[in-house]
Structure formats: structure tokens, C-alpha cells
């Protein structure tokens, strides 16, 4: 089971404890052997970072910048160095929480639909991982009173349009019950790939798979053309830049939704 056209690109800055948990999960669950390239880009790279990769995680090659470029430029620099057509992007605190068969099934589903031009980007954070971390998901499910009973169910009405995709984290049959905003695109071994317009599926730096060229073109459109001074509080980073003025929601990109493979470390 090999997906040579996919390259893993990680972005890391500090928190080597979380990075090591993530790297260990990728190797133990077979991800690093399944893809064609493994690369990690360090913001503010340190000797300890380099030593850890070169001594303990030799399936990865590394690059880095001596200063903190910010998440946006870190993403761009890392993805530029990917040696494959498609990029599975991961920040250092996302742990793989799936077995080898599930990993292959979901990655291959995404890969083949990217190849066919059916979708532009696919989310790979486990949707169920949002239920306790996303305000939208918690509001969607409904407010719970002191006795543990739901006293209101807000659903789509209580959620901004750009976050309607979060319904997949809350409702088991969300895709089937909301065919006006999403469609069943493909299926493999009962794993379904859904497609939504980006109007209803906001951008996130959480794990995603897309074409390397598509991402770099997107980055250029939102201002990441040539790096000057490192990002700071007056220079918004990727997630903020792409959401500024509702830019992402005004595009015609198609977002793929899967059950997901990665969970965010607490």
C-alpha cells in the first residue's frame, strides 16, 4: 500500500514533546512508509530539532529558518520543498489516531478525487475531535442545562454559514440530511467522502491534503508571494489572511470532508 504522489509536510516551532508524540504515531501506524516523501520545516530551527530528526526519525528530511517565520510563511516554505505532487500538511501537535487500513483508505479516497479534479482540498482532522473543542460544534449540538439535558438545539440556524461543515462532527447522518449544501462524492469500505462548497466549509490550518501547486497558487493570491519581515501582530498569518473580508467564502473551491485521521493533542 503505497501512495508515492503524496508527501507529508510538517510545520514545527518549539514543543518538541508534542512533536515527538506526533512523529512516533506517524511511524508506528505506517504513514511515513505509505507516502512518497516526509519533510519537516522548523520555524526558529534549533540544534535539538535537527538532532532529533537525524538520530531518531530518519524517515524525515528537514529544513528550517533561523527566525520564526510565522505559521503562514512556515507553511509556504515547507510545502515549497515538498517533493511530491500532493501535500498532506500537518502541524506538529496533530497525532495520528487510525490504523494502517483506515489511513490508506482515507488517503487513497482523497488522492483519487484530487487526481480526477473532483475536489480541491480535503480535511483530515478527525471530525469527532471537534465535538469538545469547537464552539460551533457545541452550539450545534445544543446547550446543556445543569441536569445534563439539552435545552435547545441550534443546528445550522445557530451557526455561521462558513462553519456549517461542522455538522459532520455532531450529526451521524448530517451529509444525507443536508443535501442542499453537500453531496456524497465517493465511498470506499463504508468510508464516505463528502463535498461542500467553500462557502460552507471554512479554511483551517488543521490537517489537509491538496495539490502542492494549488496551495502555492492560493498562498500567492492571499499575499504570500515573497517573504519580507517575519510575521507579527500587524502581519496576519495564513488562517487570518485567507479569512480576511470573507475572501475564502467568496471563492468557488470545493472542500472534501472525511471522518479524518488526526486528533489535536491537548
Question: What feature does the model see in each segment?
Answer:
Residues 5-7, 37:
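Cell-envelope/extracellular polymer assembly enzymes that use nucleotide-activated donors
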Residues 15-30:
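Short, well-formed alpha-helical segments that are part of the catalytic scaffolds
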Residues 21, 170-266:
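C-terminal catalytic/acceptor-binding lobe
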Residues 26-63:
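Acidic donor-binding segment of Leloir-type glycosyltransferases
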Residues 66-81:
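Glycine-rich, basic loop-to-helix element that forms the pyrophosphate-binding segment
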Residues 16, 69, 94-96, 100:
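Acidic metal-phosphate-binding loop of nucleotide-sugar-dependent transferases
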Residues 87:
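Short aromatic/hydrophobic "clamp" motif used to bind/position activated sugar donors
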Residues 98-128:
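Conserved donor-nucleotide/metal-binding helix-loop-beta segment in metal-dependent transferases, i.e.
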Amino acid at each position: 500500500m503505497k501512495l508515492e504522489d503524496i508527501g507529508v509536510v510538517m510545520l514545527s516551532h518549539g514543543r518538541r514533546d508534542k512533536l515527538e508524540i506526533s512523529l512516533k504515531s506517524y511511524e508506528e501506524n505506517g504513514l511515513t512508509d505509505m507516502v512518497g516523501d516526509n519533510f519537516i520545516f522548523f520555524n526558529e530551527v534549533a540544534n535539538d530539532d535537527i538532532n532529533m530528526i537525524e538520530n531518531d526519525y530518519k524517515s524525515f528530511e528537514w529544513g528550517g529558518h533561523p527566525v520564526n517565520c510565522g505559521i503562514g510563511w512556515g507553511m509556504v516554505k515547507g510545502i515549497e520543498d515538498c517533493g511530491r505532487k500532493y501535500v498532506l500538511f500537518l502541524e506538529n501537535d496533530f497525532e495520528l489516531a487510525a490504523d494502517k487500513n483506515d489511513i490508506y483508505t482515507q488517503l487513497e479516497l482523497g488522492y483519487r478525487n484530487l487526481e480526477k479534479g473532483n475536489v480541491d482540498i480535503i480535511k483530515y482532522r478527525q471530525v469527532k475531535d471537534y465535538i469538545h473543542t469547537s464552539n460551533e460544534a457545541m452550539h450545534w449540538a445544543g446547550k446543556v442545562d445543569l441536569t445534563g439535558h439539552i435545552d435547545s438545539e441550534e443546528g445550522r440556524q445557530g451557526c455561521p454559514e462558513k462553519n456549517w461543515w461542522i455538522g459532520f462532527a455532531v450529526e451521524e447522518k448530517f451529509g444525507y440530511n443536508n443535501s442542499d449544501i453537500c453531496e456524497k462524492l465517493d465511498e470506499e469500505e463504508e468510508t464516505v467522502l463528502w463535498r461542500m462548497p467553500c462557502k460552507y466549509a471554512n479554511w483551517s490550518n488543521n490537517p489537509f491534503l491538496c495539490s502542492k501547486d494549488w496551495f502555492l497558487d492560493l498562498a500567492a493570491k492571499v499575499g504570500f508571494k515573497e517573504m519580507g519581515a517575519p510575521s507579527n501582530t500587524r502581519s496576519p498569518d495564513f488562517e487570518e489572511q485567507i479569512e480576511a473580508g470573507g475572501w475564502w467564502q467568496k471563492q468557488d473551491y470545493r472542500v472534501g470532508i472525511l471522518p479524518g485521521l488526526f486528533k489535536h493533542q491537548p
